[in-house]
């Protein structure tokens, strides 16, 4: 179903795209966040897409600014991507703004897009956090069409985690939703942490495979991927397989929901795939996640599985 919504967004007219993807003047302008260790040359990328199929726009000049000063200029290729190199000298957050020059555009250029380089030492502790039904209280469809709310306590707990760790938003959302995702996070008071998204092809492969691929990529540079937080049990398996702690914030069917009993049983069955391990914690809500992470509260998969089965019996 999510794939159908994504296709509708990409193939729809400018009105549909504006609602679903936050396009501007028939253009979608993407700027990709990244992580890097100090002293390594990296590539900063921004992409211009446009038209009914959101094709890459070739031959446009994209200016990259840092601290309000022009850093470099690059021209978009056939895929609409403009790329420049940058070498962060020391750990810290390096903020850039990418801007499309108006020359060659049929309409006014889209608004500038922010790009973050989070430079960290290779042994810096990282926390990977999903967005939908984890930070955002709704699923993919509501993100495209509505104004979803944050999960209760999510911002507070993430701020607490960020005092000693680097937060990375690792979302299964495709990069087409990057501008909308960043705007939502800012509008709801979340700190500016790197947002890693994937291609449409990666989206279609499924969340677990997508997360596993990103983890493998990050592990080539960063040795302390500490915690993964999300709503999907399958994602937790990807985190655990890579030696991380996994905190599953279950997407519980609300009381009175249609087929609630079947959904509770399905969640309980899925939890069988997680062994009771001090690194696997299953909770309901960010307040419980906070206790599991900071206070060592025991939240084993088997206990949650039994709770789900007990709830199902009462339906």
Task: List each model region and its residues.
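Short beta-strand elements
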Residues: 107-125, 131, 144
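C-terminal cap/substrate-recognition subdomain and adjoining C-terminal extension
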Residues: 16-23, 143, 174-315
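Bacterial N-terminal signal peptides that target proteins for export
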Residues: 1-4
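Asp-based phosphoryl-transfer active-site loop
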Residues: 125-140, 239
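Short, surface-exposed connector motifs at secondary-structure boundaries
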Residues: 160-168, 218-225
């Amino acid at each position: 179903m999510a794939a159908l919504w994504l296709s509708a967004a990409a193939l729809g007219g400018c009105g549909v795209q504006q609602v679903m993807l936050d396009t501007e003047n028939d253009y979608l302008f993407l700027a990709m966040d990244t992580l890097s260790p100090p002293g390594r040359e990296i590539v900063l990328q921004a992409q211009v897409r446009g038209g009914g199929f959101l094709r890459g726009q070739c031959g446009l000049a994209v200016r990259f600014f840092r601290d309000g000063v022009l850093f470099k200029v690059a021209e978009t290729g056939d895929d609409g991507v403009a790329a420049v190199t940058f070498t962060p000298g020391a750990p810290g957050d390096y903020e850039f703004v990418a801007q499309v020059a108006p020359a060659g555009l049929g309409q006014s250029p889209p608004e500038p897009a922010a790009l973050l380089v989070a430079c960290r030492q290779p042994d810096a502790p990282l926390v990977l956090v999903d967005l939908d039904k984890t930070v955002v209280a709704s699923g993919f469809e509501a993100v495209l069409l509505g104004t979803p709310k944050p999960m209760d306590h999510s911002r507070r707990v993430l701020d607490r985690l960020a005092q000693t760790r680097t937060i990375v938003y690792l979302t299964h959302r495709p990069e087409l939703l990057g501008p909308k995702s960043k705007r939502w996070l800012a509008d709801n008071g979340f700190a500016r942490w790197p947002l890693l998204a994937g291609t449409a092809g990666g989206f279609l492969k499924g969340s677990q495979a997508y997360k596993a691929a990103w983890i493998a990529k990050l592990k080539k540079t960063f040795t302390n991927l500490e915690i993964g937080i999300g709503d999907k049990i399958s994602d937790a398996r990807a985190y655990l397989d890579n030696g991380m702690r996994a905190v599953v914030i279950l997407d519980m069917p609300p009381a009175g929901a249609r087929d609630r009993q079947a959904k509770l049983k399905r969640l309980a069955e899925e939890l069988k795939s997680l062994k009771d391990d001090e690194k696997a914690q299953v909770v309901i809500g960010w307040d419980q996640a906070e206790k599991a992470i900071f206070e060592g509260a025991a939240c084993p998969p088997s206990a949650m599985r039994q709770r789900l089965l007990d709830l199902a019996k009462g339906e």
